[in-house]
Swiss-Prot record:
Coiled coil: none annotated. This is Chaperonin GroEL. Pfam families: Cpn60_TCP1. InterPro entries: Chaperonin_Cpn60_CS, Cpn60/GroEL, Cpn60/GroEL/TCP-1, GroEL-like_apical_dom_sf, GROEL-like_equatorial_sf, TCP-1-like_intermed_sf. PROSITE patterns: CHAPERONINS_CPN60 (PS00296). It comes from the Bacteria. It is found in: Cytoplasm. ATP binds at T29, L30, G31, P32, D86, G87, T88, T89, T90, G413, D479, A480, L481, D495. GO terms for molecular function: ATP binding; ATP-dependent protein folding chaperone; isomerase activity; unfolded protein binding. It comes from Thermotoga petrophila (strain ATCC BAA-488 / DSM 13995 / JCM 10881 / RKU-1). Its EC number is 5.6.1.7. Forms a cylinder of 14 subunits composed of two heptameric rings stacked back-to-back. Interacts with the co-chaperonin GroES. The gene is groEL. Together with its co-chaperonin GroES, plays an essential role in assisting protein folding. The GroEL-GroES system forms a nano-cage that allows encapsulation of the non-native substrate proteins and provides a physical environment optimized to promote and accelerate protein folding. CDD domains: GroEL.
Amino acid sequence: MPKILKFNEEARRALERGVDKVANAVKVTLGPKGRNVVIEKSWGSPTITNDGVSIAKEIELEDKFENLGAQLVKEVASKTNDVAGDGTTTATVLAQAMIKEGLKNVAAGANPILLKRGIDKAVEKAVEEIKKVSKKLSGREDIAHVAAISANSAEIGELIAEAMDKVGEDGVITVEDSKTLETYVEFTEGMQFDRGYISPYFVTDAEKMEVVLKEPFILITDRKLSAVKPLIPILEKVAQTGRPLLVIAEDVEGEVLTTLVLNKLKGTLQSCAVKAPGFGERRKAMLQDIAILTGGQVASEELGINLEDLTLEDLGRADLVRVKKDETIIIGGKGDPEAIKKRIAQIKAQIEETTSEYEKETLQERMAKLAGGVAVIKVGAATETELKEKKHRIEDALSATRAAVEEGIVPGGGVTLLRARKAVEKVIEELEGDEKIGAQIVYKALSAPIKQIAENAGYDGAVIIEKILSNDDPAYGFDALRGEYCNMFERGIIDPAKVTRSALQNAASIAGMLLTTEVLIVEKPEEKKETPSIPEEF
């Protein structure tokens, strides 16, 4: 396939045009008064969004050279989204500002390699400054503010704060469609898994068709139970206590199932049998989770624990167990809190190591079940288009909130980046030549987000920047929604430090790459051969 090449200034200008097209489409969404963008879909209704990464992903330019620039900016947005879940528009605005200023200097004869070095040194100092001003989240209110700013909705902020309140930092929060127009949070308490009772004869509440066991003992094993003889000693011990028994095993059949059902019907021993959740290695891990949560042991051949030798100490305990046709919920497991913490830490480490998205999801689910539950945000809307857009905003806000829990919060509205210029000033003084110019490029770019927020809200960015910098309070900034100057922390205009940091680092990374580009190579488009037309007489 023949290729077309572009060199030097011509190549960089083509990249710049591509960058501008994407950035100009994305930056209109920045801030509380940012506009929406409507995206045509090849099927279904159009998507309405103000999420930077969703807009960037949809853009594919006709000119192949310009498209290379567009793809690089897309990379900034998606990388920031992957790391922090938000801040994609800020990252795009920063990248555009650095690229524009940088290309001016390269055209004037500056050395691109030295410019990149200066950019990197300035960004390093700015990131240190961001980390310095970050504050830990102080409670539910802060969580609500972070989520509300990301989703541009106080209602969504409250929902996420409620969900996080219930499940804690390690809990899992999922987003699903609601069957109504309402958006609300549904909470599943305790350890829940998708396996129900083996026989309907175990049912204690015929109206709801469920089994309710109060303060039961829990027998956990990875074996198939069919012969009753090995189980008789432990069944007798449990029957003497007068408490119910939940049996979790690979399968329960034959004599064992008959014995449990008959004892339940006679009233000798209230019990219920369910199959173990998962398959293979995952099943073993989940049984171990249940054992740790309830303070029991897994009666497994691998561990050398025989069913005949089981004592009441080997059984798990819980406050309550509910078993339906296809789900089991264990509430108030009596396991050692320290052992549960260790298990959660172990799963956390596995999450960090794994590269598979599926594996990550299943590990997070296991961790949430140990940590105390799963919250589901049910999203309702009048139309399919609104539902998609709302779900997307909630997912973004969730990611931003998790980022805030991780690295803390900083004043929002572009103020933190603007004030990070002070740290860059010191770098500029230390550097010389083209490296100094590189640091100045970052200095100038750090004011771009706040300028854009102000312009989207109909204000003059330069005037607002001057007024903010006249006050030394690091939290003093401009509330673009109300058009007032205020303390950003007190007003609840806050950003996760991780989002601000990632946006700056990713923007600088792409800007550096683009400035040091000398040649562009693209494939020559194939000339379409015209198909001969059929003569009219046919």
